[in-house]
Amino acid sequence: MSALRALVLLSGGLDSVTVAQMMLRRNELGACLIVDYGQPHARWEIPCAINWCGKHAVKALHADVPMLGGGGMRIGHGAAGPRVVPGRNLALISLGVSAALVHGCNAVVVGCNADDAADYPDCRVSFITAANATAMAYGVRILAPLLGMTKRQVVGEALRVGVVIEDTWSCYEPRGPAPCGTCNACRLRAAALST
């Protein structure tokens, strides 16, 4: 098998920046794909991704995919439940496979973690396994190195590989340039950082 050359799906959030930093440290990072799908937090999240790429001299590929639904829909606990774009990772991984092939990469790396699996079917081991089987038809592997980690463990890994936590964005419900502190993403991040 040839040496790993990864394309990371980079949102600018803690998880994706952590996997990008992991691949960079291993000298296996070929490029990052930054996707604007109309997410309400794009104004703050995407600059974090772009800045990370610039800081580390990593090729940043950009895609605009507004058809994914932007703000998405709520699941779970009514209006207070997590916001999701149904099948977002399915679409992003598909884009990633295409971009990987065009840009000479043989793997797509995603930042899914164990805490994501309850609310997001496309962050589960079974999904990543199936996506990998499909992508392998094109000679591209799908990797999710954080899949067995809780958000707290991701923070530990982020610190271990040198991620500047303050340079990442996790809020899905910003009311300005500061995180809301109350959305699911903010709560998970705060809990993980509290230890």
Task: Please place each PLM-identified region on the residue numbering.
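ATP-dependent adenylation/nucleotidyltransferase module used to activate substrates
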Residues: 1-162
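Local cysteine-cluster metal-coordination motifs and their immediate loop/turn environment
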Residues: 94, 167-191
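Short Cys/His-rich "knuckle" micro-motifs
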Residues: 193-195
